[in-house]
Amino acid sequence: ERTGKSVHLIYMSPQGKTLTQKRVKELANIDNIAILCGHYEGIDERVIEEIVDEEISVGDYVLTGGELPALILADSISRMIPGVLRNDEAFTLESHYNSLLEYPQYTRPYDWRGKTVPEVLISGHHENIEKWRRERSLERTFLRRPDMLSGAELSKKDIEFLQGLREKTSDELKNESNM
């Protein structure tokens, strides 16, 4: 208030709404944010009632204070600000940004403990590489965090791919139950 600028005050609290990538994107558009952290027992309820704009939680577990959640919040918001990352489009491909988990990453060497980098990734065929990445992203999300798919923008091809995964998974489960 002293500067005359409006400040959005966030209190890091296990009682707040769970932080999501959607909320991070929204917060990245707010010019002035201050983060309030409690320690052990939290902060005075009157402060929350009178000056806190929003309570945010980073998950359902106990920490000694709000400092680590505040760092998580600050880091996730800063990644959305143009110029923070070397490639401003890089964050759009990462897990959670578009309600999908990120595709698998591979580095050198080509062969590590008998496991090789998928051939499509070294083929140089960019269209096939993009298709592979999209399908692996869909597959990972389907297998590990299917709850996220409801928020994803899916093309007709994506839906067909996921239907194929459902059928494959259903068939595998049937085969296992017959053993």
For the regions a protein language model found, what residue spans apply to each?
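S-adenosyl-L-methionine/SAH cofactor-binding core of RNA-modifying enzymes
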Residues: 1-39, 82
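Short gly/pro-enriched beta-turn/loop segments at secondary-structure junctions
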Residues: 4-5, 29-30, 51, 56, ...
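Fold-independent oxyanion-binding glycine-rich loops
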Residues: 12-15, 37-40, 59, 66, ...
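Glycine-rich, flexible loop/turn motifs
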Residues: 15, 23, 43, 52, ...
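Short glycine/serine/threonine-biased micro-segments
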Residues: 36, 40, 57, 81, ...
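Structured adenosyl-cofactor binding patch, chiefly the S-adenosyl-L-methionine
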Residues: 43, 47-96
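Long, charged alpha-helical interface segments
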Residues: 96-151
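C-terminal accessory regions appended to core domains
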Residues: 129, 133-179
